Amino acid sequence: MEVFAVEGVPEVRPGDDVAELLVEQADLQDDDVVCVASTIVSKANGRGRSLSSYEPSGRAERIAATIEDIADEEKDPRMAQAILDECEEVLVEAPFILGVTKFGHITVNAGIDRSNVPGADLLLLPEDPTAEAEAIRDGIREHAGVEPSVIVTDTSGRPFRLGQRGVALGWAGLSASRDWRGEHDRDGRELEATVQAVVDELAAAANLVTGEGDGGTPAAVVRDFDFGDHAGSEQLFRDPEKDVVRQALREWSHVRD
């Protein structure tokens, strides 16, 4: 398997055709997996926002004040409001805001980016990353006559470990996971619980070569990845009612009476 960055992608602006930009910079193949940073998808969709466009609610004011008190970190109430607007549910309000986006991703600050956003204060995540992955895949087929798989990616922190890693927000052309259950290990024991989050692992591999900051590039290609003869699943996010961690967070508060 080979993973390489797509170099030379220009600064993306609202209305740009992401698929066309990628095809111009990379000789793509049918079996490739194209990993595209959510930032350029959002830029192309005009998801940049100004803080001045947000009028903070009472809840946003309270959350911002609580974060400032607990974390000794100034939090603009308008930023808190932007996060609330992008969340279906807020699980933690302080010392940071952890929420469930409207497409099911759980992340800090609703994944809102404040870096590399020319002409705006904030960059929101795509509204429907899977639909965007499908559109990019269709566009690549239209422009280049090939049909690789596409993953829209982001970087995200994780509990219990330091550091960020690449994750999949949306995907098209491949299953989210592959199921090893029913197969056997080297000692002949049947595997009972091994479901591999393929799209997340590919997103993380892509993140190793795309980099961060002003030296980064917003796309990478995974070539010669073999999914194998396994059952696949489109489900990546846990069922909220069976997610023990989510249920615990719903009951937990940093602020004690």
From Swiss-Prot:
Specify which residues bind a divalent metal cation 1 according to the UniProt entry for this protein: 113, 154
Q: What is its EC number?
A: 6.3.2.31, 6.3.2.34
Q: How is the cofactor bound?
A: Binds 2 divalent metal cations per subunit. The ions could be magnesium and/or manganese. Monovalent cation. The ion could be potassium.
| Keyword ATP-binding attached | no
Enzyme class, broadest EC rank? ligase
* Ligand binding (a divalent metal cation 2): 155, 212
Query: Which SUPFAM superfamilies does the record match to this protein?
Result: CofE-like
User: What cofactors are annotated for this protein?
Assistant: Mg(2+); Mn(2+); K(+)
Which reaction does this chain catalyze?
A: oxidized coenzyme F420-0 + GTP + L-glutamate = oxidized coenzyme F420-1 + GDP + phosphate + H(+); oxidized coenzyme F420-1 + GTP + L-glutamate = oxidized coenzyme F420-2 + GDP + phosphate + H(+)
Tell me where on the tree of life, at the top rank, the source sits: Archaea
What's a single GO MF annotation on this record? coenzyme F420-1:gamma-L-glutamate ligase activity
InterPro entries linked: F420-0_g-glutamyl_ligase, F420-0_gamma-glut_ligase-dom, F420_ligase_CofE_arc
Q: Which residues bind GTP?
A: 9-12, 38-39, 43, 116, 210-217
A Pfam match is: F420_ligase
Q: Which GO terms describe its biological process?
A: F420-0 metabolic process
Family membership noted in the UniProt record: Belongs to the CofE family.
Quaternary structure annotation from Swiss-Prot or TrEMBL: Homodimer.
The record describes the protein's role as:
Catalyzes the GTP-dependent successive addition of two or more gamma-linked L-glutamates to the L-lactyl phosphodiester of 7,8-didemethyl-8-hydroxy-5-deazariboflavin (F420-0) to form coenzyme F420-0-glutamyl-glutamate (F420-2) or polyglutamated F420 derivatives.
| UniProt protein name | Coenzyme F420:L-glutamate ligase
